[in-house]
Amino acid sequence: MHLIGEQGVGILLLVVLALQGGAMFACTGRFLQIKPEGQNIVMMENCFNTAILILFIPLIAVSLIIGWYQILDLTHLAIAIPWLIYGLEAIGIALIICGTAMVVFGFLALRNTFQPGGFAPRSQDSLVTWGIYSLVRNPLNAGVLSVTLGLALVVQSLFVIALSIIYLIMVLRVLSIEENQLSEAFAEEYRSYSQKAKRLVPFIY
């Protein structure tokens, strides 16, 4: 890690967690929910998402700050090409920053309509289509994916890459459930919105 050093990356990750946590607590919707019957993939995705944010990323951040990361991560890739290292780190840092912005603005836009992924809209909920939601329909998932992938590029870790892939698979499964729920709850309004805003990657997908 040459661009900002291991301690710099660790501090960046702690700032990311602080911003995301602050935005989440500013959101007035319910967070804890009863597990919906027959939706095991929903519970798995929510637990995995929580583990990434409150376990994996903090542990990686602390190990980077105290200089233990490369000792603890046996899947670290020892890349010997300087320009490739700098390129991966630059792209990774950009993804971390962009992903954090998506999560923060996503929480702030949702506020009291927020629910964990895979839960059907409540009767008092309205469809949020403004702010970051005008660009992408799932900024919270997209943001966490972006942060995780960015971290994998910065630390060059097969373990973190595997986390990103597993999380992506879970997210895609849960998004199919969510989209059906939103389509039933908001009918034509959601179908029209889904034609304007991308699913996960602004302007692309």
Report residues per predicted region.
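Membrane-anchoring alpha-helices and their flanking helix-loop junctions
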Residues: M1-T129, G150-Y205
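Membrane-interface loop-to-helix entry segments
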Residues: T129-L145
